[in-house]
Structures are given as C-alpha cells and as structure tokens.
A protein has these predicted regions:
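Active-site loop-to-helix "anion-binding N-cap" substructures in soluble metabolic enzymes
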Residues: 1-232, 238-305
Length: 305
C-alpha cells in the first residue's frame, strides 16, 4: 500500500474502533494528516482532557501518552510506538527530585511537562514552553525550583526577575546542541531571514533570535508575519509543516542537528498496526499515580487559562 492507501485504512479503523488520534507537531506530515488533533504539548493536554471517544492513540512520546491517561483515566490510551521515549523526561526521577525538595523546602516545584507520570506526582504545577512564563507569573510562590530543562528555566527566569529560580542541569539534547556559531552560519547564508527559536535552546542562541517561542508560537508567528523568509530553530518537522502551509514563504532549518529520533520513531505503519491490534502499547498507570499527577496538570490548565 502507498501512503494515501494506508491513511484511508487508518481513517476507517479509527472510526470503526472509536479512536481519537493525537499527534505532536514534531510528527511527520503523513501522520499529522490523519490526526484528529495536532499541536504542542500544552494544546494536546487540553485536547486530551476533552476527548469523547472511548480510545486515544498518541503519536508522540511516552510522557505525552501518560499525560493523556492522567487527564482521561476512563479512556483506553495507546502509544503508537512503544520505543518512543524522551531523553529529557528520563533525566530526572521521583527519588532524585524528592531529595532536592528536602534541600529547598520553601521552593515550589515547577515541572516541564516533559517529565514522567511518577515524577509529576510530587510537583506543584506542570508547564509547557508555551505556558511557562504565564503560569509561573500567576503562581503566588516567589521561590521556584524549575525542572528538568535548565535552558527553558533560564528563559522563564529572565522574563520574571521578581522570582527566585533554582535550576538543575537537564534539558533537551537536540535543542541544546545548537550553538551560537550555528546561528551565525545560518544568518550568513540567509541574511534576509528572521530567526525563530525554541526556548529549549541555549541562552546564547536565544539571545540571537528575532522571536522565541513554543512550537505553536513559532508556527503562528511565521504564518502571521509579513516577513517572507525564516530560519527555524526547533525540530525539523516544524519547518516542513510551515513550508507546506505557507508555500509563498521560505523556511530554512537552523541546523540539521535539529532532528529528534524519538519523535521520528513513530511511522504511519505503527499507527495502522496499533489500530489493527498488532502493535503499539496500552498505557497503564495505577489509580494513585493518576490522582497525584493530575493535580499538577490541572493546576497547569487552571493557571494557564
């Protein structure tokens, strides 16, 4: 079967089996095309909480599927590709952060959504890159322990100088590998292009950007801008989606290093096989984990508006 035929089979199966498909924006175009909802982590979290179907199929990474299960515990949630983890989410665990909390008892723990369900159970609030500044700004606490991404934490701290931040050494290895030298090379090659970067990038890269924002923020900025040429400083799929959506504009990836192997692990055939019952993985979380982890996600949605 070709791509179009597989997509049609998927559309038939998801209707037949009452499945809602969620796809992160870093997924390949052919996967996003068959999804009911696409977007960044924050949007997908909100979407997951409103799903009416009996089943949810996540095309993304494990923590995203766990978040779906936490927000919709009565649904059966599947991860299309079981091997799709997140290197950032695996950097810190509940035991480690419990020890850090003892060192800083007067600090509120703000967890990037790129964390495991188990770790979320001891955090005060979750944030995404699109909601972090707003949420932390709305928190009454002045002292913030921000985990795990130190680059995003640095970005948020600079927007909110009235708060005290403690950052740990964690982050996205894909975004963090981008350097100021990469930026200089790209700007020299495309001198008329605006640079749009994700706050998971190093501060030295963020400081050189024309716009800093989440994946959704970057896409909205580029689509609505009067400018016609952009350098995209986040996962390569965003540049590809933008080029498809805005054929009259030019999009260049900042560096070819911006490819997330975990996000690219999911294929259209994985989605098809999961719907057939021949692949994927059902996400199972115990009731206590769901109850405890849901508190910080609910707080994210409440403070994020």
């Amino acid at each position: 079967m070709n791509i179009s035929e597989i997509q049609n089979k998927i559309l038939e199966l998801k209707k037949e089996k009452d499945v809602c498909i969620l796809a992160h924006s870093y997924q390949a175009r052919e996967i996003c095309e068959i999804a009911d909802f696409t977007g960044d982590s924050y949007k997908l979290s909100v979407d997951a909480s409103k799903v009416t179907n009996k089943n949810i199929l996540m095309c993304g990474v494990r923590f995203m599927a766990e978040t779906c299960k936490i927000l919709s515990p009565d649904k059966t949630v599947y991860l299309a590709q079981p091997s799709a983890g997140c290197q950032m989410a695996d950097q810190m665990d509940k035991e480690m952060i419990s020890s850090v909390k003892e060192m800083y008892p007067d600090y509120a723990v703000v967890a990037y959504i790129n964390t495991t369900a188990d770790l979320k159970t001891i955090c005060d609030v979750c944030v995404t890159s699109s909601s972090a500044v707003k949420i932390v700004s709305n928190m009454p606490e002045k002292n913030i322990l921000f985990i795990p991404d130190c680059n995003l934490g640095d970005y948020v701290s600079r927007q909110l100088p009235n708060k005290n931040f403690k950052l740990l050494h964690g982050g996205c290895p894909i975004h963090a590998c981008v350097t100021a030298e990469d930026v200089k090379k790209a700007k020299a090659q495309f001198p008329n292009a605006e640079l749009l970067v994700h706050p998971e990038c190093q501060p030295a890269v963020v400081d050189l950007a024309d716009y800093v924002g989440s994946t959704s923020g970057i896409m909205n900025y580029a689509k609505n801008s009067d400018k016609k040429e952009f350098i995209i400083g986040t996962e390569i799929s965003i540049a590809e989606h933008l080029q498809y959506d805005c054929p009259d504009k030019k999009f260049h990836i900042l560096t070819q290093k911006l490819i997330c192997p975990n996000m690219k692990a999911t294929t259209l055939m994985d989605v098809f096989n999961c719907l057939k019952g021949e692949g994927g993985e059902e996400i199972i979380l115990d009731e206590q984990t769901i109850t405890d982890a849901k508190k910080c996600i609910d707080e994210m949605i409440r403070l994020g508006g």
